[in-house]
Amino acid sequence: MKIIGLVASPHGEKSSTRRLVSAVLEGAKKAGAQIELVDLAKARIGYCVACGTCYKTGVCPIPDEFNGIHARVKAADGVVWGSPDYFQSVSAQMKTYIDRQADCIHCQMMDGKYGCAVSVAGGPSYLEVVEYLNGVFMAMGGSAVGGLGASTSIPGSMESAEIKARDLGGELVKSIASRRVYPEQEPIHREMRERFKHLVNLNKDVWAHEFNFWKDKGWLQ
């Protein structure tokens, strides 16, 4: 079992968000998973230019580090999403990475994978970031196990969150191992599946990769 953690804070080793992602990964490792941490802020990932090439070929033509990182995420069983709260949303580094995954959401490539989200804020708005990240993951077909955050303005908040983060890592491993189903998330998955089934069918003569992906999955029935 492999779990990958994505950190989108520009603070590097000093990042509070990195501390929480690392704590989740520690809990997952203790529960038996192999882990990897990716620093999206250090990675060379440019903006999506909306060329549509990934719809046709399955590969982004921009010559940077996105394809390699994304391949490792797709190969993992679980994903830990981590971003600081910037103006009640994710950091620019995280949004840039997410925006490069149009092919991923079209093809529901997180189907069968499990994830969770963490965030750190100066105030209480980290929950909005956690909900956003889990929402993105579910929209891509994944199952969200949970999420948490911390406020640096509240004494003891980070320490408490780190303890909970380790527990969340263990819970993530359990969910993957048992193939846990979250009934409340199924309507989201069905809605996304139907939406993109229609879209891919509509563009089947142009989006060869995506049409063949759906066909091979048996989702076009």
PLM ranges: what are they?
Residues 1-103, 163-174, 179-221:
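N-terminal beta1-alpha1-beta2 submodule of the flavodoxin-like/Rossmannoid cofactor-binding fold
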Residues 7-8, 81, 117, 153-156:
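Short coil/turn segments at secondary-structure junctions
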Residues 39-42, 148-154:
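Short beta->alpha junction loops
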Residues 92, 105-151, 158-160:
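Short, glycine-/small-residue-rich phosphate/pyrophosphate-handling segment
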